[in-house]
């Protein structure tokens, strides 16, 4: 919430920040969507709400929220000796934007995580095969 408060000040916005939990935020987002009313939420990716709703990030030319982030796979150096296929897989593995969100939405909608993962793998079998060969 601190960065959001800083952004409101930095951009001179006449908004009121309403701190809440993630579930309260998505509930309010659902209500606003159902009523076709605009809303601004503090969102992050990956998150299932991006697969369910048509959301976009607002521009932040002042970089209040910082630069774009990324995720790296980090492994114990000994793993290369103990499990080379695992290391080879991790070097090839990549999610495209939105793919994690769609799997998260499936689990949010009650699907078991393994079933959601299996469905994603089935839909992207060529790519998954390239990771394990």
Question: PLM features: what roles do these ranges have?
Answer:
Residues 1-11, 15-28, 114:
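Bilobed "Venus flytrap"/periplasmic-binding protein-like clamshell domains
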Residues 47-67, 71:
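Active-site/pore-lining binding-face segments in mid-to-C-terminal subdomains
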Residues 69-82:
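A bilobed periplasmic-binding-protein/Venus flytrap-type ligand-binding module shared by bacterial periplasmic
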Residues 132-133:
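Short, solvent-exposed mixed-charge patches
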């Amino acid at each position: 919430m601190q960065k959001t408060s800083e952004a409101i000040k930095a951009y001179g916005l006449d908004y009121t920040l309403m701190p809440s939990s993630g579930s309260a935020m998505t509930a309010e987002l659902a209500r606003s969507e159902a009523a076709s009313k605009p809303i601004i939420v503090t969102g992050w990716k990956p998150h299932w709400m991006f697969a369910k709703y048509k959301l976009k990030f607002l521009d932040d030319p002042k970089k209040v929220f910082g630069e774009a982030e990324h995720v790296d796979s980090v492994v114990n150096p000994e793993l290369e000796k103990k499990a080379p296929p695992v290391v080879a897989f991790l070097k090839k593995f990549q999610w495209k934007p939105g793919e994690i969100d769609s799997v998260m939405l499936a689990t949010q909608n009650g699907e078991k995580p393994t079933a959601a993962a299996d469905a994603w793998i089935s839909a992207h079998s060529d790519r998954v095969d390239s990771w394990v060969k």
